[in-house]
């Protein structure tokens, strides 16, 4: 097994859940590299489906996506469609399956809508050097987000000794420890986990924040010093703030009121 498998688990699998952006405002490129920041079907004038999508859960969540340089020290990009693996992950331990599902491209249960972004360390911040990760923001049916959060937390507690998982494409990944670590004090509830890889030095990190029926999930690994791998609190705070603003009917912009979201700067 190589480090590429670990990176694929964090970066590749989570991109397959759909609903990724068609492009950042102002960068002039779409996911397919075309000019104008629009996907080909949008450029072709598919106004009806686009309007319906904008009014649905995924359309609302798109307004909560972070812009490219919105968080200092990080570059945030769209998650291009078609770059992730397919299929459902598995685990040798049923109790650990929620962790494998969280890392997979097909969340269980399927959310009403999702948007996915990638992030990477940038600039001169040594603590973020080599950092790679994804953000997945998903809206669920009433009660489902809380249930997913609970199952994930319970799985982490049951699988402290590690577990084996198989990606949807059949790649094997072995974790020799799962640790519940300090989580940012955000949203209705939050949790964070550190998964130690049995072969690679770089850990896989997961942070999840629930705000009502929306889960904001963050996945990260690193290509540098494994002891420095982190999911920056300022990234989590910024994303949760925008998700809360959109839930309250805002646009997700800086001017939207997110008071009461429990957000803290870190």
Residue ranges and their predicted role:
Residues 4, 10-63, 91-95, 101-102, ...:
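N-terminal low-complexity, Pro/Thr-rich disordered segments
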Residues 62-68, 146-149, 153, 233-236, ...:
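Extracytoplasmic/secreted envelope proteins and their assembly/folding machinery
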Residues 76-202, 235, 255-259:
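A small/polar (G/S/T-enriched), proline-flanked helix-loop surface module common
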Residues 126-127, 207-211:
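Short glycine/proline-enriched loop/turn "hinge" motifs that connect secondary-structure elements
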Residues 133-136, 213-222:
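Short, well-ordered beta-strand elements
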Residues 186-188, 209-215:
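Short, solvent-exposed coil/turn segments at beta-strand boundaries
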Residues 205-208, 225:
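Mobile, glycine-rich extracellular loop/lid and propeptide segments
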Residues 219-235:
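A short acidic/glycine-rich loop-to-helix N-cap element
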């Amino acid at each position: 097994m190589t480090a590429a498998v670990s990176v694929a688990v964090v970066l590749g699998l989570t991109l397959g859940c759909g609903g990724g952006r068609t492009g950042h405002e102002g960068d002039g490129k779409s996911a397919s590299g075309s000019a104008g920041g629009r996907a080909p079907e949008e450029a072709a004038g598919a106004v009806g489906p686009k309007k319906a999508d904008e009014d649905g859960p995924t359309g609302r969540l798109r307004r909560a996506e972070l812009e490219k340089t919105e968080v200092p020290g990080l570059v945030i990009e769209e998650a291009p469609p078609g770059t992730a693996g397919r299929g459902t992950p598995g685990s040798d331990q049923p109790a650990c399956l929620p962790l494998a599902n969280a890392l997979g491209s097909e969340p269980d249960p399927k959310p009403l809508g999702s948007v996915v972004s990638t992030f990477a360390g940038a600039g001169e911040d040594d603590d973020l050097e080599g950092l790679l990760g994804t953000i997945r923001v998903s809206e669920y049916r009433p009660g489902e987000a809380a249930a997913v959060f609970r199952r994930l937390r319970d799985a982490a507690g049951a699988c402290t000794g590690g577990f084996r998982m198989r990606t949807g494409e059949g790649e094997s990944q072995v974790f020799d420890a799962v640790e519940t670590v300090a989580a940012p004090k955000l949203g209705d509830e939050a949790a964070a986990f550190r998964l130690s890889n049995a072969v690679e030095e770089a850990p896989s990190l997961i942070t999840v924040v629930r705000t009502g029926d929306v889960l904001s999930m963050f996945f990260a690994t690193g290509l540098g010093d494994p002891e420095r791998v982190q999911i920056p609190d300022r990234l989590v705070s910024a994303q949760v703030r925008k998700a809360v603003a959109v839930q309250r009917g805002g646009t997700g912009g800086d001017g939207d009121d997110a008071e009461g979201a429990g957000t803290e700067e870190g």
